[in-house]
């Protein structure tokens, strides 16, 4: 008979404690412990469900054979880009995102578009008829895609073993449970053990498994933090529900570059890949407008240009307002302090509002120069000269530092027809400078206005 044990788990990080604690000693969060009843079976859940596996033996690195098909084309160029060129056989991939952002749509498109591959789509949230309706709306046909509405882990593993698919999609990990644990689906212990079982099965059979995870109100993936540690890839699906564009961002990738992004457009027929993000992030105005600047950014290995909008106005109240959309407010406050200290602009009595086009969330320090350029333009109510963009990081002393992969940013600006780009003067002399674009170098932020307003 199984030995029943009660334990308390932190909902934030999965830390286990024998009694309730007000504050988690692992992550430091308050009031996150919940009680769960766990039935301890002989052996781990993963070993019981997935079955016994042959013991591995140490091998020399040179003796290990690489798979002939090291990457699986999932049938979507943007997803392939974020994964580093395709899905690696035997990998466990976690996709997180807000409700309604399009996680299920993207995962179903991947399962249907993987031509030549046998796929199994496991849904714990929808019936087979509902999935069929969504598949018809997407307009993608794949006779090799199997639909399986199920939540019991043991049944799922049995079907995977019977059909031997190349790709399995689990929607979602919070709805899957095992009978070997007494806790409910979505609990810390259930998520941890189900993920560990799927990981063991993926590594032993070479089946790629794509699991969807819900997120909490603070934007992190629900469940124990160990879930993100054990998977090979963590993808974050971002976007504004009021905007048609979505970003797939690689947070963790054992087989490729991290923070690589893929851009999608949400249509009635599903998600469409956007191969050139710069085209949707830039707007061509009939007349020059103040408060608008263009920054050359680079996420992962992909450069793109994005429009930055700023509005600087007199503070109506004693304390000025500072508001941002898609940007870190603390970093904007730092840049405003640099402008006041190093350039002499009286920002302490100004309201400042900042927005990035397309509802994008950016954290690239190489966009500091573009943010400051938009603020300066709005402050003096003077439009930035036509065909000018910026790429550089600003330090607390007002110095302009080179942005990572500046050469790629310059090349992207030249490809899109920009006439001038403002970068750091500390960029090496050996840096490549493409033809057709003037590279203006500055060493400090007080030199920026002259570079922006010169026609």
List the predicted regions and their residue ranges.
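P-loop (Walker A) phosphate-binding loop of NTP-binding proteins
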Residues: 98, 124
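Conserved SAM-binding strand-loop segment of SAM-dependent methyltransferases
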Residues: 147-148
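Conserved RecA-like ASCE P-loop NTPase motor core of nucleic-acid helicases/translocases
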Residues: 119-123
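Conserved Rossmann-like nucleotide-cofactor binding loop
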Residues: 127
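Peripheral, non-AAA+ core regions of ATP-driven protein-machinery
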Residues: 2-12, 16-83, 88-94, 101-112, ...
